[in-house]
Amino acid sequence: MNKEQITKLQNVIKTINAKIVEARRKYIFWCPKDMDIEHKKQGYTLYAYGGRVLDLYLLNGVMRYSVWDKDYKSYSEEIDKIREILINKSGTADKKIARLTSISTEDWEKVLTAFKTWAEYIDNNKKTTHFERMRETAIANKNQAFKNGNIKIIEMESRNAIGKKPDLIGVRREKDNIILSYIEYKCTTAAMTGTQSPVEHYKDMKKYYKDRTPAIFESYFERSCWENNDKAKPDDAFDLKNATKEIVFLFSHITDENNESNKSQELTVQDVLTGIKAIKTEMGRSNDDVKIMFIKDECERLKTDNKHMMTVQDAIKWLEAKKVR
């Protein structure tokens, strides 16, 4: 995809963004994506509150889109009417794009309200099923600048041919080194046990880490830089095929387990400590580059100083010291 093609896509993105009220923008993220395994459908996915709202892409040079799944109508009957307008197959490709860009601010508000309801829905077991995805979207939105000492997020919910997927993928610079960060995010107790536990995700991430072709991410990085007018333009882009790779476990919303006001959804120090110790045991003598990151909440930047990013062993020591206090 060349710069002219990306500009066409981004003009549509700008039109849509102008219809989204400021209060909602924190929880949206336009993510560079290839919509098929052959990389013939290249474009962007709009995530809102963790859910996939829209795929906007080029196919054989023609701009097209697909929209949210019909199942979201259970959270709002009104958005199903908007969906019916958008999936109308009549007219040329240009007319279909015109229908998309003509959706009003009021209708976009209905759509995003429905996605927020989906994210905050509590099932019969009193567990918020998509809370992490909602916060994950905000983290991706917040971390779009490519600066020394920070991780720039270039993709979320990335999936490869073997089906393994990190929550977020980022790029960072450390002196003269460029590093691809495969990030697994945890912020609730429900995501710390069973198949969702950190150690199980570590096993999956190792497979992804070895299987996924970093060249794909080079394209995502370039598109992300163009989209955000980043100083790291594609002309100066880095060869991500030869980038160093790391696995990162990111934790937020950690509370004191002795605090009586602690909600069941929030992580405790012990939750995180147990999870990281299991990772350490699974790592054994491997040379995998695994980092642990801590942020207060989804509004914080992903800084890579030693207060936020640590080795597995240092994270264990830090958490054990917190438990003693």
Task: Map each language-model feature to its residues.
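Charged, terminal alpha-helix-loop-beta segments
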Residues: 1-325
